[in-house]
Regions:
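Membrane-interface extramembranous regions
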Residues: 2-160
Length: 160
């Protein structure tokens, strides 16, 4: 009776080590996207004075000359929220193995990088994370293109 509860070895999906490594990297990248998107709420909180620190004017920033209570600073504060949902959508697409996740990740990262550059010193870690994401996206695109062209060549050889 207990044998029926245990899965049979031949019924389990057989996946190679490459598949598991690729899935682990995808999950880790998705977690990075989610974490970086959540951190963007700090930028929003700081610009509206909700964070308990004056990170808007701490260190070297390109927006230090702006009025902290002015409409420009508040518009930039709202802009800090934009990458959050973009990163969440990108992470969902990545985990679900959809083809569109790269575009969402790229859009989120470009907006994030622009905001982090405006707050250069307080957001230095964000710049490093954004550059890491951009490099990762570039590597992914190159590897995916090579894989697709290898697959196409191999299928052409089989049809000859």
């Amino acid at each position: 009776m207990t044998d029926s509860i245990q899965p049979q070895a031949d019924t389990l999906p057989h996946r190679g080590a490459e598949w598991w490594v690729a899935r682990a990297i995808a999950v880790l990248a998705a977690l990075l996207f989610v974490q970086h998107g959540v951190v963007h709420f700090m930028g929003f909180a700081c610009t509206f004075g909700l964070a308990g620190s004056d990170a808007v004017n701490d260190g070297y920033t390109l927006v230090a000359a702006l009025d902290p209570d002015g409409w420009t600073m508040h518009a930039l504060g709202v802009a800090w929220l934009l990458p959050s949902p973009l990163y969440l959508v990108a992470s969902a697409g990545l985990v679900l193995r959809r083809n569109w996740w790269q575009a969402w990740a790229l859009a989120a990262t470009v907006v994030s990088l622009a905001l982090c550059i405006l707050w250069l010193q307080p957001a230095a870690v964000g710049i490093a994370v954004d550059i890491t994401i951009l490099v990762g996206l570039a590597v992914y695109v190159v590897l995916a293109h090579r894989s697709a062209s290898c697959t196409a060549r191999s299928s052409r050889r089989r049809t000859r």
